[in-house]
Amino acid sequence: MSAFITFEGPEGSGKTTVINKVYHRLVKDYDVIMTREPGGVPTGEEIRKIVLEGNDMDIRTEAMLFAASRREHLVLKVIPALKEGKVVLCDRYIDSSLAYQGYARGIGVEEVRALNEFAINGLYPDLTIYLNVSAEVGRERIIKNSRDQNRLDQEDLKFHEKVIEGYQEIIHNESQRFKSVNADQPLENVVEDTYQTIIKYLEKI
């Protein structure tokens, strides 16, 4: 039984922490792997350093680098795992590009979708968990946790508000694969809600 489950959300939504905790619960009963974008494979990790830690770059260059990393990650890690019948939990996927580069950067959602559809070749997630939190709360968490801020973290509040608007538009248009989880609650509640959402999906397939 394979399933491709992606996690989306604005900066400070707690995605990485939630995925880790959900993974350690799921692995007791399912053949599951956890991965991330950009990254997940050596080439992807090198691209991650460029787009998240490097200097400012042309917005279309940024979008193409994310798409290139995505393709390499799919071919080397995600697709083989799905063929082996695994459950794949992925921290970010195509919807991040649509929300960040397509909407917030202003390239255009459909333009970025076309670029990424070439990269993913039809492989959309079976289920996408959206961790819903406001830009203000996300920013406060990043500052409070003193985490290392990447290039996207350092964008202004208006940019992050646009990211959320982009996600809302995507979810409205593709509501069948999205499940929204309230991430503005205690972490253990977010983890439990996310875990139960995934279990309900897996029990149906």
From Swiss-Prot:
NCBIfam families: DTMP_kinase. Gene3D superfamilies: P-loop containing nucleotide triphosphate hydrolases (3.40.50.300). CDD domains: TMPK. One of its GO terms (biological process) is dTTP biosynthetic process. InterPro entries: P-loop_NTPase (IPR027417), Thymidylate_kin-like_dom (IPR039430), Thymidylate_kin_CS (IPR018095), Thymidylate_kinase (IPR018094). This is Thymidylate kinase. It is an enzyme of class 2 (transferase). Belongs to the thymidylate kinase family. The lineage of its organism: Bacteria, Bacillati, Bacillota, Bacilli, Bacillales. PROSITE patterns: THYMIDYLATE_KINASE. GO terms for cellular component: cytosol. Phosphorylation of dTMP to form dTDP in both de novo and salvage pathways of dTTP synthesis. ATP binds at residues 9-16. It catalyses: dTMP + ATP = dTDP + ADP. One of its GO terms (molecular function) is ATP binding. It comes from Staphylococcus aureus (strain MSSA476). Its EC number is 2.7.4.9.
